[in-house]
C-alpha cells in the first residue's frame, strides 16, 4: 500500500475513534453500543450463534435455531455471508487461539460492538475518501466529504440498532467507482468486484444500492464529467455483462439467501401509502438524517454549479431529499412493502459528494455569492424553528445553530483569505460532524433510545442471562445429556433465549423464518405465541400433544407462572425462582406411522383434531394411497352457557364497558370429571383503528397488535389451551371487538397415551447429528413412514441404504419419508437451497470475470 494510502487510512481511523468518543466513554463505564431492542434480541445473538457454528466447521444448519433451520439462508439478511463479520470472526478466533479473550457469548459481542464499529467506520471513510478523490482530484476536500458521509447520524443509528445495515456503506462508494471506471475508462473490474461484494453481503441492501447506481448512471448520462467518456451503448454493454458476471460470482451466497427470503411468510402491506409527507425536520431533529449546513450553503452558491461533479451530486441529493419525504419512495426501496427509511445512507453519500465538490471550489468562492446564500440558509433555519416550534435554547438545537454560524463565518473567511482559511473550513466541517455525531449518540441514542440501559449489569441479570437461570439449565443438561432434547423456556419476550443460554428450544425471532413453520403456528395448528408478530414464533401454547410430537422434554418457568404448566409435566428441578418440569408422555425423536391423513380432509377441523391425527399417524398434503378417517372432537359450545360481565355480547360483537375490562364467560353445563384440558377457539378482531390490546383466557395471557401495525399477522383465529375448570373467561380491555365462531373442545389425552404406548418398543439406532448431517438406523417390521421433528425445508437430501429417496412435508411443516421393511440405514444431509449448482456458477463466473477483465484491459483494473 502506498504511503499516502496509509496516511489516509490513519486519518480515517483517527476520525473514527473521535466520532465514537461518547460510546468509548460509555464502554469504559460498562454501557455498550447496542440497542435494547433488536440489538440485544438479534444482533449480538446471531453473531454468537454464527461464530460458534463457523468456528466448529458448521456453515449451513443449526438445530438450535428455533425448531431448527438453515442458518446460511435464513440469516443471510443478517451476518451469515457478511465479509465484515467473517473478517471480525477471524480476528476474534485468532485472539481466542492465543488466549487473549475468553468466551464469545452475547456479553462479549456487546462489549466489542464499539470497537467493531470503529474499524468499520474507518473503512467507510477510507473507501469514500478514495472514491471522492478519484472524482475530484482534491484530497482534503475528498476526505472532508468522506467524513460527512461516514459520521452521518444514520450510520450511528443503524450501527447501534441494526449493526449489519451499515455494512453496505462500505460497498456503495465502490459501486460508484466501478460505474465511473466503466464510463470513463472502459474498465469493468471495479464494478464487478463492488457489485459482487454487495450482492454477496446482503441481498436487501444490494437491491437499494443497485437502484441507486441505476439512477446515478442516468444522471451521469445527463452530466458528462470528462470529455472522452465511452459511448452509451458501450457503457450499457459493459454494465450488462459486468452485472451478469457479478450475479454469477455471488450466486453461491445470493441464490440461497434470496430463496430464504422468498420462503418467508409475510402478510401483504394493505394500508394506504402517502406520496409525500413533510413532517420530518431534517435540519434539527430528524432521527435519520441531519443535513449539514455546508451542503445547504453550497446549494445556493450559483458558481459551484459550473463544477460538473457538484452539479451531479447536488442533483442526486435534491432527488433523494424528495425521496426522504415520500413514504411511497420508502416503500419502493423496501421492496414495495411497508415504508421504511433504510435507504437514507444513499442520501448521506450524495450530500457528502456535493459537499466535497463544493469544498474543492473554495478558491472560486466569491463574497457576493456567499452573502445571499447565507441569507437564504438562515431563513430556512428560521422557518424550521417556527414551523416545528423548536426551543432554540435546548442544547441540541443551540449547538446546530452555533455550528451553522461557525460554518458561515469560516466560509466568509475563505472568501476573503482564500488559501489561508481553507483549512479552517475543512476543520470546522469535520469538527462539526464529530460534534453532531457525539451529540446524537448522547441525546438521541443513549438517553432517547435507551442505549444507556444496555449495561454489563443488565446483560448478566436474570432479565437477560442471569446466573440462577443459567446454572439451572446447566444442571439439567449435565443430568440429561440427550443432545436433541428441547426445553421450552423464554426469558420474558426474548424469543432467542435458547441461543443466548445455549439449549435447544421452541422459539425464534428473525426477519426471515421458514414459512412452513410460520403457517404451522398461525394457520394449521393455530398455536398462540403469547405475542402476535410476523417475525417470531414461540413456545407451543402449553399444549401437551405438541410437546410430545416435537420432542419437548422439559418445560421451564418462573415459579410465579406455574399455572401454565402443560398437562403431563412433572416437577423435576427447581431453584429459588425457577422450576423445570419433565414431560411424562415423551415420544421418540424418530416416530413411525402407517396411518395416513389428508391435509385437505383436516382443513376445516379444529386444531385438536389435527393434533390427534399427528399422534395416530402422519398428515400429508397429497397422500397417494388410502387415508384414515379424521378425528372429530365434539364441540361443547352448544352445551355451555355464555354470559357477559362488564360487557355486552350480541350478534358476534363484544362491547366491553368496564374501565378495568370485561369478560365473556363460558360455562360447560355437563363438564367431564376426567382430567385434561379445554381448547377454546374463536375469531377475535378489535374495532379500534390503531390500538393493541391484551387478551386473557383464564390464566393465559397474550397480546395482539394494532390494526395498523406493520408487524400484525392478519390472523385473527385464536386457539387457547386452558386447564379444566368450572368456566372459561375471555377477558378484554375496554373497547369493541368482533368475537365470533366460538368453539370449545375437551382433551383427555387418551390419544397421546396410546401413542406413547405404541412407540415405546421402537427406537432408532446409532442416531448421530454432526453439523449438517443426521444419520441413524431403523429396523421396520413392515413398510412405514418415518417422521422427524425437524422442519421441512428445501435443501435436505435423503439416502436410505445408499440410495437417494424423496423427502415429503409431513404434519404440515416437518420431515417425513417412506421406509421399507427391514433394516434402513438413513442419512439426511442439508445444504442451502440450490447451493451446489450455485457454487458451480460462482466458480465459472469468477473464471469468466478474470478472462473478461484481462480481455478488456490487460494488466489493469
UniProtKB/Swiss-Prot annotation:
InterPro entries: Uncharacterised_YfhO. Keywords: Cell membrane, Coiled coil, Membrane, Transmembrane, Transmembrane helix. This is Uncharacterized protein YfhO. It comes from the Bacteria. It is a multi-pass membrane protein. The keyword Calcium does not apply. The lineage of its organism: Bacteria, Bacillati, Bacillota, Bacilli, Bacillales. It comes from Bacillus subtilis (strain 168). Signal peptide: none annotated. The keyword Endoplasmic reticulum does not apply. It is found in: Cell membrane. The chain crosses the membrane at residues 4-24, 75-95, 106-126, 159-179, 199-219, 238-258, 282-302, 313-333, 343-363, 370-385, 396-416, 425-445, 833-853. Residues 738-766 form a coiled coil. GO terms for cellular component: plasma membrane.
Amino acid at each position: 500500500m502506498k504511503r499516502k494510502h496509509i496516511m489516509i487510512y490513519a486519518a480515517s481511523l483517527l476520525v473514527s475513534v473521535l466520532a465514537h468518543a461518547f460510546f468509548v466513554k460509555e464502554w469504559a463505564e460498562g454501557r455498550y453500543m447496542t440497542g435494547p431492542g433488536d440489538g440485544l434480541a438479534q444482533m449480538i445473538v446471531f453473531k454468537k450463534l454464527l461464530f460458534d457454528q463457523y468456528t466448529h466447521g458448521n456453515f449451513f444448519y443449526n438445530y438450535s435455531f428455533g425448531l431448527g433451520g438453515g442458518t446460511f439462508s435464513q440469516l443471510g439478511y443478517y451476518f451469515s455471508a457478511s465479509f465484515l463479520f467473517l473478517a471480525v470472526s477471524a480476528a476474534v478466533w485468532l485472539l481466542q487461539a492465543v488466549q487473549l479473550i475468553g468466551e464469545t457469548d452475547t456479553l462479549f459481542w456487546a462489549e466489542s460492538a464499539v470497537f467493531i464499529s470503529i474499524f468499520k467506520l474507518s473503512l467507510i471513510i477510507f473507501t469514500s475518501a478514495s472514491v471522492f478523490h478519484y472524482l475530484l482530484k482534491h484530497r482534503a476536500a475528498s476526505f472532508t466529504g468522506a467524513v460527512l458521509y461516514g459520521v452521518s447520524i444514520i450510520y450511528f443509528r443503524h450501527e447501534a440498532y441494526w449493526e449489519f445495515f451499515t455494512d453496505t456503506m462500505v460497498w456503495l462508494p465502490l459501486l460508484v467507482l466501478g460505474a465511473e471506471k466503466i464510463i470513463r475508462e472502459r474498465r469493468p473490474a471495479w464494478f464487478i468486484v463492488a457489485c459482487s461484494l454487495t450482492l454477496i453481503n446482503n441481498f436487501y441492501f444490494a437491491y437499494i444500492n443497485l437502484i441507486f447506481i441505476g439512477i446515478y448512471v442516468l444522471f451521469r448520462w445527463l452530466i458528462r464529467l470528462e470529455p472522452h467518456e465511452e459511448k452509451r451503448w458501450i457503457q450499457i454493454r459493459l454494465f450488462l455483462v459486468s452485472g451478469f458476471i457479478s450475479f454469477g460470482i455471488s450466486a453461491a451466497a445470493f441464490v440461497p439467501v434470496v430463496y430464504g427470503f422468498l420462503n418467508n411468510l409475510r402478510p401483504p402491506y394493505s394500508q394506504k401509502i402517502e406520496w409525500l409527507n413533510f413532517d420530518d425536520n431534517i435540519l434539527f431533529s430528524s432521527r435519520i438524517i441531519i443535513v449539514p449546513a455546508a451542503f445547504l450553503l453550497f446549494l445556493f452558491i450559483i458558481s459551484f454549479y459550473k463544477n460538473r461533479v457538484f452539479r451531479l451530486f447536488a442533483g442526486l441529493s435534491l432527488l433523494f431529499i424528495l425521496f426522504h419525504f415520500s413514504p411511497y419512495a420508502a416503500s419502493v426501496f423496501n421492496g414495495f412493502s411497508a415504508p421504511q427509511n433504510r435507504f437514507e445512507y444513499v442520501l448521506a453519500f450524495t450530500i457528502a459528494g456535493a459537499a466535497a465538490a463544493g469544498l474543492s471550489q473554495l478558491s472560486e468562492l466569491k463574497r457576493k455569492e456567499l452573502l445571499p446564500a447565507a441569507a437564504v440558509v438562515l431563513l430556512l433555519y428560521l422557518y424550521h424553528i417556527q414551523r416545528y416550534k423548536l426551543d432554540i435554547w435546548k442544547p441540541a438545537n443551540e449547538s446546530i445553530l452555533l455550528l451553522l454560524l461557525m460554518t458561515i463565518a469560516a466560509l466568509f473567511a475563505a472568501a476573503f483569505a482564500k488559501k489561508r482559511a481553507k483549512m479552517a473550513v475543512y476543520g470546522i466541517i469535520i469538527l462539526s460532524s464529530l460534534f453532531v455525531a457525539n451529540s446524537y449518540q448522547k441525546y438521541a441514542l443513549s438517553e432517547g433510545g435507551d442505549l444507556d440501559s444496555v449495561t454489563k449489569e443488565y446483560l448478566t441479570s436474570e432479565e437477560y442471562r442471569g446466573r440462577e437461570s443459567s446454572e439451572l439449565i446447566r444442571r439439567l443438561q449435565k443430568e440429561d445429556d440427550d443432545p436433541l432434547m428441547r426445553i421450552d423456556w423464554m426469558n420474558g419476550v426474548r424469543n432467542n433465549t435458547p441461543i443466548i443460554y445455549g439449549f435447544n428450544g421452541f422459539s425464534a425471532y428473525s426477519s426471515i423464518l421458514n414459512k412452513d413453520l410460520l403457517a404451522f403456528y398461525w394457520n394449521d395448528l393455530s398455536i398462540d405465541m403469547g405475542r402476535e408478530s410476523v417475525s417470531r414464533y414461540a413456545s407451543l401454547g402449553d399444549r401437551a400433544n405438541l410437546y410430545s410430537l416435537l420432542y419437548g422434554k422439559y418445560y421451564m418457568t418462573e415459579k410465579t407462572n406455574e399455572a401454565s404448566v402443560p398437562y403431563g409435566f412433572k416437577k423435576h428441578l427447581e431453584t429459588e425462582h425457577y422450576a423445570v418440569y419433565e414431560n411424562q408422555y415423551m415420544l421418540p425423536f424418530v416416530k413411525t406411522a402407517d396411518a395416513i391423513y389428508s391435509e385437505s380432509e383436516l382443513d376445516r377441523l379444529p386444531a385438536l383434531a389435527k393434533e390427534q391425527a399427528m399422534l395416530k399417524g402422519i398428515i400429508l398434503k397429497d397422500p397417494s394411497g388410502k387415508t384414515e378417517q379424521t378425528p372429530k372432537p365434539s364441540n361443547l359450545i352448544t352445551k355451555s352457557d355464555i354470559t357477559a360481565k362488564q360487557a355486552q355480547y350480541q350478534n358476534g360483537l363484544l362491547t366491553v364497558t368496564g374501565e378495568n375490562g370485561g369478560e365473556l364467560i363460558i360455562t360447560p353445563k355437563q363438564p367431564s370429571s376426567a382430567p385434561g384440558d379445554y381448547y377454546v377457539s374463536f375469531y377475535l378482531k378489535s374495532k379500534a383503528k390503531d390500538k393493541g390490546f391484551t387478551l386473557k383466557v383464564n390464566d393465559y395471557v397474550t397480546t395482539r397488535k394494532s390494526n395498523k401495525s406493520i408487524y400484525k399477522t392478519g390472523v385473527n383465529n385464536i386457539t387457547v389451551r386452558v386447564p379444566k375448570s368450572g368456566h372459561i373467561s375471555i377477558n378484554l380491555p375496554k373497547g369493541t371487538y368482533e368475537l365470533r365462531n366460538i368453539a370449545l373442545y375437551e382433551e383427555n389425552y387418551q390419544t397421546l397415551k396410546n401413542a406413547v404406548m405404541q412407540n415405546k418398543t421402537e427406537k432408532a439406532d446409532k442416531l448421530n447429528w454432526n453439523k449438517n448431517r443426521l444419520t441413524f438406523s431403523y429396523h421396520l417390521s413392515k413398510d412405514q413412514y418415518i417422521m422427524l421433528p425437524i422442519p421441512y425445508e428445501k435443501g435436505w437430501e435423503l439416502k436410505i441404504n445408499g440410495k437417494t429417496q424423496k423427502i415429503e412435508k409431513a404434519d404440515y411443516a416437518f420431515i417425513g419419508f417412506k421406509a421399507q421393511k427391514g433394516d434402513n440405514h438413513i442419512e439426511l444431509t442439508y445444504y442451502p437451497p440450490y447451493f451446489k449448482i450455485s457454487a458451480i456458477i460462482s466458480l465459472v463466473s469468477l473464471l469468466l470475470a478474470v478472462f473478461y477483465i484481462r480481455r478488456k484491459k490487460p494488466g489493469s483494473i
